[in-house]
Amino acid sequence: MAKETQLQVEAIKNGTVIDHIPAQIGIKVLKLFDMHNSSQRVTIGLNLPSSALGHKDLLKIENVFINEEQASKLALYAPHATVNQIENYEVVKKLALELPEKVNNVFECPNSNCITHNEPVASSFQVFEKKEEIRLKCKYCEKVFAREIVTER
């Protein structure tokens, strides 16, 4: 007997589906793209069952298409997420996530002594991997931080 499967989150006609987001990260991704302030319909699935991750988050954003730059920012939070662009209920494009080399004016430097807290300069981080851990190095104070420390702020 074939196992029946049913979508736990309704399909969208046009927009972006971000799947395989690690559990507990979906809300952060939503805020990263400022979707919590959007007038478009956003469907959020939190702690959904996943054979690969155990549990995962999922975002479906109607009538919004994520560009390559946004996808690279997403890679900081969910490097193995899948991003599908949907048109007329069909996947028309899959965006591959790649870590950006630099991230500018997105995160605040965790170092309270960094010049970015007192001067009108945009934050800037170099992004790299070390032993499969994502690290960010501040352009100004040159301190290196684990991704979680920078993205939690």
Swiss-Prot record:
* UniProt cross-references to HAMAP family, sorted A to Z: Asp_carb_tr_reg
Q: Which cofactor does it need?
A: Zn(2+)
Phylogenetic placement of the source organism: Bacteria, Pseudomonadati, Pseudomonadota, Gammaproteobacteria, Vibrionales
* Task performed by this protein: Involved in allosteric regulation of aspartate carbamoyltransferase.
Q: One GO cellular component from the entry? A: aspartate carbamoyltransferase complex
Checking NCBIfam families in the record gives:
ATCase_reg
Keywords in alphabetical order: Metal-binding, Pyrimidine biosynthesis, Zinc
Gene Ontology terms describing biological process: 'de novo' pyrimidine nucleobase biosynthetic process; pyrimidine nucleotide biosynthetic process
In terms of Pfam families, this protein maps to: PyrI, PyrI_C
The family assignment reads: Belongs to the PyrI family.
**InterPro entries linked:** Asp_carbamoyltransf_reg_N, Asp_carbamoylTrfase_reg, Asp_carbamoyltrfase_reg_C, Asp_carbatrfase_reg_C_sf, Asp_carbatrfase_reg_N_sf
Annotated protein name in UniProt? Aspartate carbamoyltransferase regulatory chain
Q: How does it assemble?
A: Contains catalytic and regulatory chains.
Which GO MF terms are attached to this record?
A: metal ion binding
Indicate which residues the UniProt annotation says bind Zn(2+).
Answer: 109, 114, 138, 141
Describe cofactor binding as the record notes it: Binds 1 zinc ion per subunit.
